[in-house]
């Protein structure tokens, strides 16, 4: 195994999770590169100590031991690897590609097959934990792939993860575990929004309702994290409504392929879809509460 400073990794996709993962790689002493179309994110990563940050991987592709993809969906993963940027064709044979986007199991398998044509190794490795845990190097990784892929990515996994779950060798297992996790995450947000909407309708102050739930048995991590945004009237997106339209769509597609009923997930999917259709798709996912009529929600307090 190389010394950490000799190990080079590029993180593609410097959103809240990707930026945190890249910063954690820098903090762990890895030679870290960043790729994104956002110039502010690139400059911020340079300031954090990246070896280089650019809109394309061309200048440093041949230096890399690993690539981490933290983009929105399978379309973006395929476009980056095999589309116009042709990232896969520019990497050295044997480079390991960690695909951490939330995608279907079939998409993961298809991507792995195409990477193998370029003699590249894939780890199917979705992540969870949010921006704060990404920045702290404490994400949860649910991964499947070969022993070789895990071995090649050990410096990266050590840098970005608090927990790494090895689901098995078959590509697609990691993707499926993440999809099932997203079922719970989406249902928790939708249920939390419904409860807070009922409280608003009943003229219960939402800050009091929030305080009661977060100190009682009905609490969940998603309620505590997302319903705080409702109380604050701040729908600046940490994760957008449209992300859960996508993720719960993957949940329902997975269930359909298995002929398996998901009544709660289907309802949550419809709630997020309604919120997106009403114009809230780019807002924080807690904005799903805005589908309820006849209630008054807190407004964001402007800083003095």
Curated annotation (Swiss-Prot):
The lineage of its organism: Bacteria, Pseudomonadati, Pseudomonadota, Gammaproteobacteria, Enterobacterales. The active site is at residue 178. It catalyses: L-threonate + NAD(+) = 2-dehydro-L-erythronate + NADH + H(+). One of its GO terms (biological process) is organic acid catabolic process. This is L-threonate dehydrogenase. Keywords: Carbohydrate metabolism, NAD, NADP, Oxidoreductase. Belongs to the HIBADH-related family. L-threonate dehydrogenase subfamily. It comes from the Bacteria. Its EC number is 1.1.1.411. Catalyzes oxidation of L-threonate to 2-oxo-tetronate. Can use either NAD(+) or NADP(+) as cosubstrate, with a preference for NAD(+). InterPro entries: 3-OH-isobutyrate_DH-rel_CS, 6-PGluconate_DH-like_C_sf, 6PGD_dom2, 6PGDH_NADP-bd, HIBADH-like_NADP-bd, HIBADH-related, LtnD, NAD(P)-bd_dom_sf.
């Amino acid at each position: 195994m190389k010394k950490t400073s000799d190990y080079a990794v590029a993180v593609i996709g410097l959103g809240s999770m990707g930026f945190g993962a890249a910063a954690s790689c820098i903090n762990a002493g890895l030679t870290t590169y960043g790729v994104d179309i956002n110039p502010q994110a690139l400059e911020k990563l340079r300031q954090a100590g990246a070896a280089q940050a650019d809109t394309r991987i061309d200048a440093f592709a041949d230096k890399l031991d690993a690539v981490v993809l933290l983009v929105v969906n399978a379309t973006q993963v395929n476009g980056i690897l095999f589309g116009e940027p042709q990232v896969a064709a520019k990497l050295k044979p044997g480079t390991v590609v960690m695909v951490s986007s939330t995608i279907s199991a079939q998409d993961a398998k298809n991507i792995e097959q195409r990477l193998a044509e370029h003699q590249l190794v894939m780890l199917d490795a979705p992540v969870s934990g949010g921006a704060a845990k990404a920045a702290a190097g404490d994400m949860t990784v649910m991964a499947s792939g070969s022993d070789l892929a895990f071995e090649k990515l050990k410096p990266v996994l050590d840098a970005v993860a608090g927990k790494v779950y090895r689901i098995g060798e078959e590509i697609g297992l990691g993707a499926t575990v993440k999809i099932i996790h997203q079922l719970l995450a989406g249902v928790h947000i939708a249920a939390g929004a419904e409860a807070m909407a009922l409280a608003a309708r009943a003229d219960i102050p939402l800050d009091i309702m929030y305080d009661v739930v977060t100190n009682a048995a009905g609490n969940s991590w998603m309620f505590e994290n997302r319903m705080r945004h409702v109380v604050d009237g701040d729908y600046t997106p940490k994760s957008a409504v449209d992300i859960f339209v996508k993720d719960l769509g993957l949940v329902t597609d997975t269930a359909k392929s298995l002929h398996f009923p998901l009544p709660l997930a289907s309802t949550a999917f419809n709630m997020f879809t309604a919120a997106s259709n009403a114009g809230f798709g780019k807002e924080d996912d807690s904005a799903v509460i805005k589908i309820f009529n006849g209630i008054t929600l807190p407004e964001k307090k402007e800083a003095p």
